[in-house]
C-alpha cells in the first residue's frame, strides 16, 4: 500500500502519540455522540484507529470491531497495548479504502475520529463514497473534524463542517447530530466538531437501535 500523505509524521512519533492518545478515554472522546451509537452487539469499523483505544473499548462493550490503521508503527503499538481485546486489525487507508471495500463487509457503525482533516478537499468525494459503501442500511458514521493551527510536519486542513455535511447528504447520509467541544489535551487554539450521520434504511428492514433507544426498552417490554 502506498503511504498516505496524511500519515506524515505519525510513524516516527508512534510511542509518544500512544501516550497522548491513551491519556484520554473513549467515553471522553465520544461523549457528544456515544448515546446515539448502535447498541451491542453491532459490527463496527474504526478507520484510522491509531493505537486502538476506541476499538478496544467498543470490543469490551460487546461489539465486533475491525480497526483499520495505515501507519505500521501505530498499528504495532495498538496490537501490543490491546492484545486480547478481540479487535481485528487491517491495513487500509482513505480516500478509497480499497481492501475494506473489496472485502464486502458492511458495518452498523463507522468511526472516523481525528482523521477527516488529513484529507485534501479534493479527496473528500471519493472518501465519502467509500465510507457510504461500507455502511449497512441504517448504519451510522461518526466523524470528528479538528479546527486550529496545523502542527509542524503534519498534513492537515482546517475546514468548516458545512461542506462535509453537504457532501454526506449527496451520498444519502442524513445528519443526526452535530456538536462542538474544546480540545481534550488542553490546547486552547484547537477545538473540534463532532458529526453523526445515518444511512437510509432499506424499506421494511429493522432500524439499528442506538444505546439510548435500547436503554428505553426495559426487560419486561422486550
Where do the protein language model's features map onto the residues?
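Short catalytic micro-motifs in class I SAM-dependent methyltransferases
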Residues: 114-115
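Short, conserved loop/helix-junction motifs that constitute active-site signature segments
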Residues: 133
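Class I (Rossmann-like) S-adenosyl-L-methionine-dependent methyltransferase catalytic domain
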Residues: 1-102, 119-126, 130, 140-222
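A conserved beta-strand element that flanks and buttresses the S-adenosyl-L-methionine
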Residues: 111
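Conserved acidic residues
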Residues: 108
